[in-house]
Amino acid sequence: MTRLETRTEPMVLNMGPHHPSMHGVLRLIMTLDGEDVVDCEPVIGYLHRGMEKIAENRTNVMYVPYVSRWDYAAGMFNEAVTVNAPEKLAGVAVPKRASYIRVIMLELNRIANHLLWFGPFLADVGAQTPFFYQFREREMIYDLWEAATGYRMVNNNYFRVGGVAADLPYGWVDKCLEFCDYLLPKVDEYERLVTDNPIFRRRVEGIGTITREEAINWGLSGPMLRASGVQWDLRKVDHYECYDDFDWDVQWETAGDCFARYVVRMREMRESVKIIRQAIKGLPGGPYENLEAKRLAAGKKSEWDAFDYQFIGKKVSPTFKIPKGEIYARVESGKGELGIYLVGDDNVFPARWKIRAADFNNLQIVPHLLRGMKVADIVVILGSVDVIMGSVDR
């Protein structure tokens, strides 16, 4: 009896740039052999807006409102690194109160970033409910930002060279503490819903595994790196702002799969709440209303008017010149290492403004992870990376 031999030709498939699970305008050219992924080629650049070139034609004061559009899920980190680079190069001192306020805003942004990752990732896996839950919590962060900065999600335009744009308003500290008390039980609720769910575990455990050596060699950072067994967090390594004043731990896992990346991010939300509570408790001068009362009671030229109790050190003029020299400044964003390589030329405009986006580097490993996997695992692996195309394409 003769057997018929069937041969299948590899199929080339386009995913994106309008696919709902692409997390922006990312296009993947997939080569498939049946259900198996043979090759993957990411096509980026659909959201390129020339952010580095724009920076070379704007003063630092003018450029801060632009930067929220890089990683539009976490705009505060972009603002932080945008002012940190000129501060380091020009030797601008930042008051301790301003530094504490910055840390509070950055950690709120880290929580918001991880919440916005959590919802769509679970939707990619097949769980729709948490997608709506996380917006409830994120809305409260928006309200806090709106009270402090005047804007909700992006374009807060809050960070300044030498400090922040305005002090925290009346009652803001109490509202922030209320949010911290509210969030922790909700994170526990997420964990009860998701972490031990057998369907979720089978979708993510052992999928998209990255070894410690691979994570380092590919230049990964953030939860992608820490989930592969590398204890590397720039808040501990670089000692920037005032993170050394607080008691908190670097969260990490060793498995390196999608589940490990999920666990790291969930734990980081708890650590962020821990940092926010300590920053509010140790805020120099206390809440704004208390600080105002102390200043009025002590009269002019009191200790409460000292440098460390200001929200900004010295307001820089619109003609603030970036000194001649070069520097690399970086912060630990929700996605990893966000860096700026700045070249100054004793001019109001920078000579070069190079952006090192965390998710641009993290996206590089996706084709390597997808080869040999099933089609159903594509969106799970991509979702676990946490990619925002505004930051990748810039």
Curated annotation (Swiss-Prot):
<keyword id="KW-0793">Thylakoid</keyword>
<dbReference type="InterPro" id="IPR022885">
    <property type="entry name" value="NDH1_su_D/H"/>
</dbReference>
<comment type="subunit">
    <text>NDH-1 can be composed of about 15 different subunits; different subcomplexes with different compositions have been identified which probably have different functions.</text>
</comment>
<dbReference type="GO" id="GO:0048038">
    <property type="term" value="F:quinone binding"/>
</dbReference>
<keyword id="KW-1278">Translocase</keyword>
<dbReference type="InterPro" id="IPR014029">
    <property type="entry name" value="NADH_UbQ_OxRdtase_49kDa_CS"/>
</dbReference>
<keyword id="KW-0874">Quinone</keyword>
<comment type="function">
    <text>NDH-1 shuttles electrons from an unknown electron donor, via FMN and iron-sulfur (Fe-S) centers, to quinones in the respiratory and/or the photosynthetic chain. The immediate electron acceptor for the enzyme in this species is believed to be plastoquinone. Couples the redox reaction to proton translocation, and thus conserves the redox energy in a proton gradient. Cyanobacterial NDH-1 also plays a role in inorganic carbon-concentration.</text>
</comment>
<dbReference type="GO" id="GO:0051287">
    <property type="term" value="F:NAD binding"/>
</dbReference>
<dbReference type="InterPro" id="IPR029014">
    <property type="entry name" value="NiFe-Hase_large"/>
</dbReference>
<keyword id="KW-0520">NAD</keyword>
<keyword id="KW-0472">Membrane</keyword>
<dbReference type="GO" id="GO:0031676">
    <property type="term" value="C:plasma membrane-derived thylakoid membrane"/>
</dbReference>
<keyword id="KW-0521">NADP</keyword>
<keyword id="KW-0618">Plastoquinone</keyword>
<dbReference type="Pfam" id="PF00346">
    <property type="entry name" value="Complex1_49kDa"/>
</dbReference>
<dbReference type="GO" id="GO:0016655">
    <property type="term" value="F:oxidoreductase activity, acting on NAD(P)H, quinone or similar compound as acceptor"/>
</dbReference>
<keyword id="KW-0813">Transport</keyword>
<protein>
    <recommendedName>
        <fullName>NAD(P)H-quinone oxidoreductase subunit H</fullName>
        <ecNumber>7.1.1.-</ecNumber>
    </recommendedName>
</protein>
<comment type="similarity">
    <text>Belongs to the complex I 49 kDa subunit family.</text>
</comment>
<dbReference type="InterPro" id="IPR001135">
    <property type="entry name" value="NADH_Q_OxRdtase_suD"/>
</dbReference>
<dbReference type="GO" id="GO:0019684">
    <property type="term" value="P:photosynthesis, light reaction"/>
</dbReference>
